[in-house]
């Protein structure tokens, strides 16, 4: 197919159907395709590889964790439940900050960096609540309560009751903003209200 003046290779029909149309044996066609793939990969290896952004983001992982819990509720498939538990254990142990309730925003190459934002905490708390619902293990709800208290202590604006996007002790910002409108994902304030 053609996309933005470039050719994108795609398969339009099953191999066996194409082989019959072209009067070629299926095994012979598979050998031809394997040889073509080798040539294409050789040419591709000559190109500069695109940059790879493989950092782990706390909020995004928490969103995925909630999705796994919901998938378990909908399907009863235990692999979703186990994935949610394993992912939560990873987040709680690898993204932990200077104290038990402070977390980092990203994790890459064995290092957690940057203080977590409001939405990171909000999505993490939400994921903990859903995880407690599917496991009946009270450790998750207890951690959600501790993190909620941490958010209230470190993010709240007393006059309005809204939460700032950054913690009170973050020094590398000029102005602390509040996000109160939802976009592609709900704002941290919306999720905290739901939690």
Predicted feature locations:
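Glycan-recognition and catalytic cores of secretory/periplasmic carbohydrate-active enzymes
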Residues: 1-195
């Amino acid at each position: 197919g053609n996309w933005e003046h470039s050719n994108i290779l795609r398969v339009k029909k099953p191999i066996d159907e194409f082989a019959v149309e072209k009067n070629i044996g299926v095994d012979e066609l598979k050998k031809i395709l394997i040889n073509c793939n080798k040539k294409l990969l050789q040419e591709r290896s000559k190109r500069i590889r695109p940059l790879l952004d493989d950092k782990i983001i706390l909020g995004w992982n928490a969103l995925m964790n909630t999705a796994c819990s919901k998938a378990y509720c909908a399907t009863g498939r235990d692999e979703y439940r186990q994935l949610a538990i394993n992912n939560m254990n990873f987040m709680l142990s690898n993204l932990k900050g200077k104290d038990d309730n402070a977390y980092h925003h990203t994790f890459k190459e064995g290092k957690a960096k940057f203080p977590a934002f409001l939405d990171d905490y909000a999505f993490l708390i939400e994921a903990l609540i859903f995880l407690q619902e599917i496991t009946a293990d009270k450790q998750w709800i207890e951690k959600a309560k501790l993190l909620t208290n941490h958010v209230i202590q470190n993010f709240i604006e007393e006059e309005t009751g809204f939460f700032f996007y950054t913690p009170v002790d973050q020094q590398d910002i000029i102005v602390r903003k509040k996000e109160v409108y939802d976009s592609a994902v709900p704002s941290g304030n919306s999720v905290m209200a739901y939690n």
